From Swiss-Prot, chain A:
InterPro entries given in the database record: BSD_dom, BSD_dom_sf, Tfb1/GTF2H1, TFIIH_BTF_p62_N
The protein's role, per its UniProt record: Component of the general transcription and DNA repair factor IIH (TFIIH) core complex, which is involved in general and transcription-coupled nucleotide excision repair (NER) of damaged DNA and, when complexed to CAK, in RNA transcription by RNA polymerase II. In NER, TFIIH acts by opening DNA around the lesion to allow the excision of the damaged oligonucleotide and its replacement by a new DNA fragment. In transcription, TFIIH has an essential role in transcription initiation.
Protein origin, superkingdom: Eukaryota
Description of how the protein assembles with itself and partners: Component of the 7-subunit TFIIH core complex composed of XPB, XPD, TFB1/GTF2H1, GTF2H2/P44, TFB4/GTF2H3, TFB2/GTF2H4 and TFB5/GTF2H5, which is active in NER. The core complex associates with the 3-subunit CDK-activating kinase (CAK) module composed of CYCH1/cyclin H1, CDKD and MAT1/At4g30820 to form the 10-subunit holoenzyme (holo-TFIIH) active in transcription.
Disulfide topology: none
Subcellular location: Nucleus
Name of the encoding gene: TFB1-3
Annotated protein name in UniProt: General transcription and DNA repair factor IIH subunit TFB1-3
One of the GO biological process terms: nucleotide-excision repair
Curated annotation (Swiss-Prot), chain B:
Transmembrane domains' residue ranges: none
A molecular function GO annotation: zinc ion binding
Organism of origin: Arabidopsis thaliana (Mouse-ear cress)
Function in brief: Component of the general transcription and DNA repair factor IIH (TFIIH) core complex, which is involved in general and transcription-coupled nucleotide excision repair (NER) of damaged DNA and, when complexed to CAK, in RNA transcription by RNA polymerase II. In NER, TFIIH acts by opening DNA around the lesion to allow the excision of the damaged oligonucleotide and its replacement by a new DNA fragment. In transcription, TFIIH has an essential role in transcription initiation.
Keyword annotations: DNA damage, DNA repair, Metal-binding, Nucleus, Transcription, Transcription regulation, Zinc, Zinc-finger
Pfam families: Tfb4
Name the record gives this protein: General transcription and DNA repair factor IIH subunit TFB4
Protein's gene: TFB4
Assembly, per entry: Component of the 7-subunit TFIIH core complex composed of XPB, XPD, TFB1/GTF2H1, GTF2H2/P44, TFB4/GTF2H3, TFB2/GTF2H4 and TFB5/GTF2H5, which is active in NER. The core complex associates with the 3-subunit CDK-activating kinase (CAK) module composed of CYCH1/cyclin H1, CDKD and MAT1/At4g30820 to form the 10-subunit holoenzyme (holo-TFIIH) active in transcription.
Keyword Endoplasmic reticulum: no
Segments forming C4-type zinc fingers: 259-276
Entry's Gene Ontology BP terms: nucleotide-excision repair; regulation of DNA-templated transcription
Length: 579, 301
């Protein structure tokens, strides 16, 4: 039951508009404004008393519910009949709660329902009329409980929860080298504007820079001095003079950190190469960027000059930068730190790296497995013995042997009615007597009665014409479309109901608790009731459609018959155990 | 006779092979007597012969223990006997009834010799179908001018599951020969064999509801020749009982196991196929994985 109300926490409260949803177990108030956090959930058995204004007085239709904890909830309805309906519903629910105090234990799981879950169930019932019909048929008549009904529909509930998952924020595809300074043109001073986003990207792509930041700031230098040195190093790279870079690196050891190859990245690459299966035919130990070969690799600034060997460590190729940047973008944002403090960001990234490094550590067993695979790969196939596949030889036997071997089965397992020799003899005598009769008397006159012949002809004509109309020349049309709409809806609803009952029935076996035994009894009664409804429906259908409806109803009855048979046999077995 | 008519067969010349159920265990339990049944059938056969002068009729008796030809309208011994012996019986069927009586006597003697008494009281449908197909094959080989053959099964006995393989083989042979099998079941149950036979071969299957009107059913549905069936609406089945019999216990099943080599049907899981000897359950992948498991465990021990 659902009504539109205005909720008040006290009498003079202006009130909040929303909808009041009532069930025998719970009372739920949802305001119309989604942003409002004034949502109310009250268990029925927690309601102590209710007061209401009388019709005909000057007051609006109010219903005041007092809980056992002393709180009051005032609902103002749109009209007095709505208020009376809710009042009567709550009165009945309260009476049931008092009549069945022992069943509160069964209702305990309902209390643990979250507000969102409860709203979701009501929403699903509101949207799906068929689901609402089933819910009304089974839950309100107490064949199933709320939890039993929804336990088979977790997909419906889970579908909405999937939508709540947030999409992870990615990274920009702009490279760090794309940062451009601003210049005033008159002096040689350039200015770099760093945002937290840029800093995050630098830390993600260059672990050595991140580690240097943690080591030097703020003990040895300020954050501004740190970034000044970093961009000085970047400037030296952009020039073509590696000799100047080497000279400055010799003087300033802190600047040299930015000019050396990133040792952390090299270590990670070596670990990844170690995880590669050694049976793969791959030169994983050789440099995969060809920088060890002369005249290979393009410099970042696009030049192709030959570099002197002693400054080889100061080189960085464009390919390495591109690969590193792509790896970082694909890895995505692995931490959710939104802090403006640069140190917190650097430390969080370092911890994330350490965690992933621990996960990727190679254990002893993995080493052993790698060694086994390595030794197995070195075997040469042409020196191995041919493998013997475990296949049985195929033999098509003589069919006569097959049929003769089956004779024993027939004798050992008798089937069908046993016909004694005396009965056979009498039957043969009767048959010969019939032949003698027809030889003596000949064909009967008349051979067939005219009214019988007409009846046969009429029924055949009706059968053939009916079959033509049903099968027809339109394969898209099914027989259900030819039924009246009410009968068709009834058939489909019965099918849905029987599926629900049968699913719960078979999932209750084996019966291990009293709860399951009670549940199976309820389901059996509900199935008996449905069986009677099926028979009534068959009789109420018109005579020309009855045969088709019988064909449609037969699988439903077979499913119910199987359930009844299992119920009776299981009941006998459990009764025999008790005896 | 003066001159044999030349063979000029048109589309509607038919050869009807009738399989007549003479199982005494069935006829002792029916509401209609065998003599009444024979009246309808003989009148029907006379009508078929009257539809076209060149039509042929062959009757095969299907007994409890044996089968035999009891009438063949193309034999010269059945021509020329036009004397009437005073009764209402046409003399043309005198030999049929005489042979039927002899057949029943022989069938009774054969049933006495049977050791097994636990058989389902079914008739030898597979045997009579095979004999009908042999006769039709001889007709096919006599020349390209021949009447169009079809088979009509008049049966009331229940299905014998032990004949499943033989019946299905006959049905597939008839399908290959393009010979339709019409079936008229007058028993109380449904016959899965006859339903499948008519469905597979393109014949007509019908279960009459009023047995005292059998002649009307036969002339309305089953007297139609193959050419005319293209213009006539005949009863169509709403559903076909496609259940099979298992090869191990010979009982009817609707769900079971099947050998992927020879397509034998079993009602329970076997380790080996009793027809072709294939071993079930053991496959190459299972052994390969177990072998690799052993190899992995050895070094760690």
């Amino acid at each position: 039951m659902e009504k539109r109300v205005k909720y008040k926490s006290f009498v003079k409260d202006p009130g909040t508009l929303g909808s009041l949803e009532l069930s025998e177990v719970m009372l739920l108030f949802v305001p119309n404004d989604p942003k409002s956090d004034l949502k109310l959930k009250v268990q029925t058995h927690n309601i102590k008393s209710q007061k209401y204004t009388k019709e005909g007085s000057n007051k609006p239709p109010w219903l005041n519910l007092t809980s056992k904890q002393g709180r009051s909830h005032i609902f103002e309805f749109e009209n007095y009949p709505d208020m009376h309906a809710c009042r009567d519903f709550i009165t009945k629910a309260l009476a049931k709660c008092e009549e069945e105090p022992n069943k509160l234990v069964v209702l305990t799981p309902a209390e643990q329902l979250s507000m969102a879950e409860f709203e979701l169930r009501f929403k699903l019932l509101r949207e799906n009329s068929e689901l609402q019909k089933l819910h009304k048929q089974f839950v309100e008549s107490k064949v199933l409980t709320e939890d039993e009904f929804w336990s088979t529909r977790k997909k419906l509930l889970g579908k909405d929860s999937i939508r709540k998952s947030k999409q992870q924020m990615g990274l920009k595809s702009m490279m760090v080298s794309g940062i451009k300074p601003s210049t005033d043109g008159r002096t040689n001073r350039v200015t770099f504007n760093l945002t937290s986003e840029i800093i995050f990207q630098i830390f993600a792509e260059k672990p050595a820079v991140r580690q240097a930041f943690i080591n030097y700031v703020p003990k040895k230098m300020t954050e501004k001095d740190f970034w000044t040195k970093y961009f000085r190093a970047e400037y030296l790279y952009s020039t073509k003079n590696t000799a100047v870079a080497a000279a400055e690196a010799a003087e300033d050891e802190e600047l040299a950190v930015f000019l050396k190859p990133d040792e952390i990245l090299a270590q990670e690459a070596r670990q990844k190469m170690r995880r590669v299966d050694p049976t793969l035919d791959m030169d994983a130990d050789e440099g995969d960027d060809y920088t060890h070969l002369m005249d290979h690799g393009i410099q970042r600034d696009g030049t192709n000059d030959i570099i002197e060997p002693q400054n080889d460590q100061l080189k960085r190729s464009l390919l390495q930068d591109l690969n590193r940047h792509a790896a970082v973008v694909l890895e995505g944002r692995c931490i959710n730190v939104q802090s403006e403090d640069t140190r917190i960001v650097a430390e969080a990234l370092t911890r994330a790296k350490q965690v992933s490094k621990a996960d990727g550590e190679i254990t002893k067993d993995a080493n052993q497995e790698r060694l086994e695979r390595m030794s197995r790969a070195t075997e040469m196939e042409d020196l191995q013995a041919p493998q013997n596949f475990p296949l049985a030889p195929l033999s098509i036997k003589d069919p006569r042997d097959y049929f003769e071997s089956q004779q024993g089965n027939i004798l050992s397992e008798p089937r069908g009615a046993k016909a004694s020799k005396r009965n056979v003899h009498e039957a043969y005598g009767l048959l010969k007597e019939s032949i003698l009769v027809i030889r003596m008397t000949g064909l009967s006159d008349p051979l067939i009665k005219p009214e019988v012949s007409f009846e046969v002809f009429s029924s055949l004509t009706r059968t053939i014409s009916t079959a033509k109309n049903i099968l027809g020349k339109n394969p898209q049309e099914s027989f259900l479309d030819r039924l009246p709409k009410s009968t068709k809806d009834e058939v489909i609803h019965h099918w849905t109901s029987i599926q629900e009952l049968v699913r719960h029935f078979w999932s209750s076996y084996p019966i291990t608790t009293t709860y399951l035994s009670t549940k199976v009894g309820k389901l059996k009664d509900a199935m008996s009731n449905t069986y009677s409804l099926l028979d009534a429906m068959k009789q109420s259908v018109q005579s020309d459609l009855r045969h088709q409806v019988s064909l449609l109803v037969r699988p439903m009855q077979q499913a119910l018959d199987a359930a009844f048979q299992h119920y009776e046999s299981d009941l006998q077995r459990r009764t025999a155990k008790i005896t | 006779m003066p001159a044999i008519a030349s063979k000029q067969y048109s589309d509607d010349v038919s050869l009807l092979v009738l399989l007549l159920d003479t199982n005494p265990l069935f006829w002792s339990t029916t509401s209609i007597t065998f003599s009444q049944f024979l009246s309808h059938v003989l009148a029907f056969l006379n009508a078929v012969l009257g539809l076209n002068q060149l039509n042929q009729v062959v009757v095969i008796a299907t007994g409890y223990s044996s089968c035999d030809y009891i009438y063949d309208s193309s034999l010269t011994s059945n021509h020329g006997n036009f004397e009437s012996n005073g009764t209402g019986m046409p003399a043309i069927f005198g030999s049929l009834l005489k042979k039927l009586e002899e057949f029943v006597t022989k069938d009774e003697e054969l049933s006495k010799e049977e050791v097994s008494e636990d058989r389902i009281p079914s008739c030898l449908l597979s045997g009579s179908l095979s004999m009908a197909l042999c006769y039709i094959q001889r007709v096919f080989r006599s020349g390209h001018l021949h009447p169009q053959p079809r088979i009509l099964c008049l049966q009331g006995s229940p299905d014998g599951p032990e004949q499943y393989v033989a019946v299905m083989n006959s049905i597939f042979s008839a399908q290959r020969l393009m010979v339709p099998i019409d079936s008229c079941y007058i028993g109380v149950q449904n016959s899965a064999f006859l339903q499948q036979a008519s469905y597979i071969t393109g014949g007509v299957h019908h279960t009459p509801k009023q047995l005292d009107g059998l002649f009307q059913y036969l002339t309305t549905i089953f007297a139609t020749d193959l050419h005319s069936r293209g213009f006539v609406q005949l009863p169509k089945p709403i559903g076909v009982d496609f259940r099979a019999s298992c090869f191990c216990h010979k009982k009817t099943i609707d769900m079971g196991y099947i050998c992927s080599v020879c397509l034998s049907i079993f009602c329970e899981h076997h380790k080996k196929c009793s027809t072709c000897g294939s071993v079930f359950g053991q496959s190459k992948l299972d052994d390969a994985s177990s072998a690799s498991d052993k190899k992995r465990k050895a070094p760690s021990t």
